[in-house]
């Protein structure tokens, strides 16, 4: 494989088709973050790249894949043939919907499904914790002390805001279209928990269809290493400039 298009601070970008670049890397990874074309339009960039599931399966046994239910159903055979087994999925709730069909409910979500190969015990699956748990305690009324007047004892009410809880399967992450460099760019707020689930601290991630390389930005934020592959040289250049700007705080969710 040729030298990386970009390399710096635990991140590499390779220019090319992932089906050709992946076998040439000669490396394995803790997990993959994949955002393939959904095939929902007739646009050239939205065509499903046949064979990518097998190519990814040769370098990792754990994968998060974004998509729509229609996409997963239409290409189910490719996942099966590559010996990927479905673990579970999460729903990414978006602030802006897609689709303009007047006879269908406006879709404001996408799916991210987790797939694995081999033994479940051999892949990382550490459920992230969020600090937004809420505990409410309300003491019951005491027994009526005066049936005529209906007098009751005092009550107390307490609530604790914040605290740890396991991440739930619906994740809200807003898109900032004004700052995005790619039309299907994923927010860091959806990528970060997926990475924390499937990749141990200091571990490695492969993104075979990287686009804006948001996976690489999220990897830096969480202390992981990332290799990104992108077929569009113009997008590689934009992503490289973005990575050269350094890690932005999580408030920048795009």
What are these regions (language model features)?
Residues 21, 67, 71-75, 218, ...:
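Phosphate- and divalent-cation-binding pockets in alpha/beta enzyme and binding domains
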Residues 4-13:
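Beta-strand-turn-beta hairpins that frame and shape the catalytic cleft
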Residues 34-35, 65:
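Active-site beta-strand/loop signature of hydrolases that rely on acidic residues for catalysis
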């Amino acid at each position: 494989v040729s030298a990386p298009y970009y390399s710096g601070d635990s991140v590499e970008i390779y220019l090319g088709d992932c089906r050709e670049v992946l076998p040439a890397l000669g490396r394995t990874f803790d997990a993959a973050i994949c955002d393939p074309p959904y095939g929902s339009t007739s646009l050239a960039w939205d065509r499903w790249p046949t064979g990518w599931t097998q190519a990814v399966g040769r370098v990792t046994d754990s994968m998060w894949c974004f998509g729509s239910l229609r996409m997963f159903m239409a290409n189910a055979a490719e996942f099966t043939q590559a010996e990927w087994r479905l673990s579970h999925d999460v729903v990414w709730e978006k602030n802006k919907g897609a689709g303009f069909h007047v006879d269908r409910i406006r879709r404001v979500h996408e799916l991210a499904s987790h797939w694995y190969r081999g033994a479940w015990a051999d892949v990382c699956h550490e459920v992230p914790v969020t600090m937004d748990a809420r505990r409410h305690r309300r003491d019951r009324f005491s027994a009526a002390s005066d049936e005529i007047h209906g007098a009751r004892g005092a009550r107390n009410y307490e609530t604790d805001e914040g605290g740890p809880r396991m991440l739930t399967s619906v994740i809200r992450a807003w898109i900032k279209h004004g700052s995005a460099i790619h039309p299907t760019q994923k927010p860091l707020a959806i990528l970060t928990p997926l990475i924390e689930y499937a990749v141990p601290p200091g571990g490695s991630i492969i993104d075979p269809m990287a686009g804006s390389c948001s996976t690489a930005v999220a990897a830096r934020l969480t202390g992981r290493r990332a290799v990104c592959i992108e077929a569009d040289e113009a997008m590689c250049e934009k992503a490289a400039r973005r990575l050269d700007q350094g890690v932005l705080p999580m408030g920048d969710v795009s």
